[in-house]
């Protein structure tokens, strides 16, 4: 099927090209004709007053935790995990995670997010919800070596890989999800490493999120979490490290040498008082840094426009440098850099031959005027409610701000039902 996105403002190569046209053929972007004829295409979408951006890439999520939104706020990370989140997680099941995930995907699509990278439990349920919604996703079974089900969870991750890697017309990839060094002892990390090497599976892990995590690791092993994982050989496989807030120069050197990608979660890190990651140092060292929301339990929304704006603002202030993260760099972190974090080299840019994950942003709002610079407006003034049309893998999943793949009324009803079930134990 061929689709023409007609007369859009096209974001390409860091510039805006007004009155452009995008032709999508199947799941790929085909061309950018100057004078297209409507009758040559199966469908034509009027892009007047629309800004075309690559679909946003959320590099670190726990979508099943969306049902924890507003349940446990204003707490430090370990208090939040140990006393609030982990006890409730004991009562999760496939049905609860499916509808929590579907709620997350409705929010993501509505806000222009087309790809997500998730680590959690009941990941088949997450995958089924993502497939129904039409999302693109990297799935990982969260692994905790200190858990009674440590071995079975690792086997679940292998089965997840066999079932979902490459599924959904190529929309899904599978990663291994060792939670963190403080939940995965060295011997368990070695098991994860060996399986990663055997099946050629990339890694998704939390690292250096808090100062306490780093201090405890130094006390127990004499190494930072980054140095410990490197010492154990985990970084021999492609690795996406979430957070990396408390990393030193040697950590950054290791990450750059081993091509470790970073999922920067500014909103979650600020809310949990974890700190501000040294993103400028990492990027200047050649490390690929994408953006993530973390879960709705710790953010509390899955809004990549908010994360792009935060990424641009906090690093300016933290470095006393107005050029620290520019509007363009913030958008690129939310698109092309995020796509690289997920293992793609044909996603995150609007170029011929690239996967057709495209969003059209309505520029008619008051906050889009006057329009001197649409790139700056997208990064600093735009918000998720501006998104009008969303395409994933060449398929329309939202048009005229209406979700096409998700029954929102049913989602709200099912979320109400499973939330009552989940919290009946508390």
Set out the residue ranges of the language-model regions:
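Divalent metal-coordination and catalytic microenvironments
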Residues: 8, 22, 27, 49, ...
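Active-site microenvironment of metallo-dependent hydrolases
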Residues: 1-20, 24-25, 30, 34-38, ...
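Active-site gating loops and adjacent loop-to-helix segments of metal-dependent hydrolytic enzymes
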Residues: 67-99, 106, 133-144, 211-238, ...
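Metal-coordinating catalytic core of metallo-dependent amide/deamination hydrolases
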Residues: 125-245
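His/Asp/Glu-enriched, well-ordered alpha-helical/loop segment
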Residues: 231-234, 238, 280-365, 381-383
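Catalytic core of soluble alpha/beta enzymes
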Residues: 209-233, 237-239, 244-257, 270-281, ...
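Alpha-helical scaffold segments that flank or form the walls of functional sites
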Residues: 69-135, 156-167, 416-425
């Amino acid at each position: 099927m061929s689709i023409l996105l007609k007369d859009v403002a096209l974001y390409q190569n860091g510039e805006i090209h007004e009155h452009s046209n995008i032709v999508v053929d199947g799941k790929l972007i085909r061309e950018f004709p100057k004078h297209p004829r409507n009758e040559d295409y199966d469908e034509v979408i009027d892009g007047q007053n629309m800004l075309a951006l690559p679909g946003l890439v959320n590099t670190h999520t726990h979508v099943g935790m969306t049902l924890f939104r507003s349940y446990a706020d204003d707490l430090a990370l370990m208090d939040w995990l140990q006393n609030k989140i982990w006890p409730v997680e004991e009562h999760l099941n496939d049905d609860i995670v499916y509808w929590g995930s579907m709620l997350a995907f409705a929010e993501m699509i509505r806000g222009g997010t087309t790809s997500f990278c998730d680590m959690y439990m009941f990941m088949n349920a997450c995958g089924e919800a993502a497939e129904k919604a039409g999302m693109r996703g990297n799935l990982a079974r969260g692994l905790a070596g200190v858990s009674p089900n440590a071995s079975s969870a690792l086997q679940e991750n292998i089965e997840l890989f066999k079932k979902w890697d490459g599924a959904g017309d190529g929309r899904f990839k599978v990663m291994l999800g060792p939670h963190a060094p403080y939940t995965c002892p060295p011997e368990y990390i070695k098991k994860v490493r060996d399986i990663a090497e055997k099946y050629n599976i990339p890694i998704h892990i939390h690292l250096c999120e808090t100062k306490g995590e780093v201090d405890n690791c130094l006390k127990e092993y004499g190494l930072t979490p980054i140095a410990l994982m490197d010492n154990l050989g985990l970084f021999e496989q492609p690795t996406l490290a979430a957070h990396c807030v408390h990393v030193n120069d040697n950590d950054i050197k290791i990450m750059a040498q081993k091509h470790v990608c970073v999922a920067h979660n500014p909103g979650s890190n600020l809310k949990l008082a974890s700190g501000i990651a040294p993103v400028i140092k990492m990027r200047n060292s050649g490390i690929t840094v994408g953006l993530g929301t973390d879960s709705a339990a710790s953010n509390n929304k899955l809004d990549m426009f908010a994360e792009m704006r935060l990424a641009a603002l906090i690093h300016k202030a933290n470095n006393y440098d107005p050029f620290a993260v520019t509007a363009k760099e913030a958008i690129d972190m939310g698109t092309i850099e995020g796509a690289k974090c997920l293992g793609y080299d044909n996603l995150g840019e609007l170029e011929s031959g690239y996967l057709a994950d495209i969003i059209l942003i309505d520029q008619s709002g008051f906050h889009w005027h006057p329009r001197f610079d649409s790139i700056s407006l997208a990064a600093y003034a735009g918000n998720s409610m501006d998104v009008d049309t969303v395409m994933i893998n060449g398929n329309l999943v939202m048009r005229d701000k209406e979700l096409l793949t998700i029954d929102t009324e049913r989602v709200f009803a099912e979320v109400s039902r499973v939330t009552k079930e989940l919290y009946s134990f508390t």
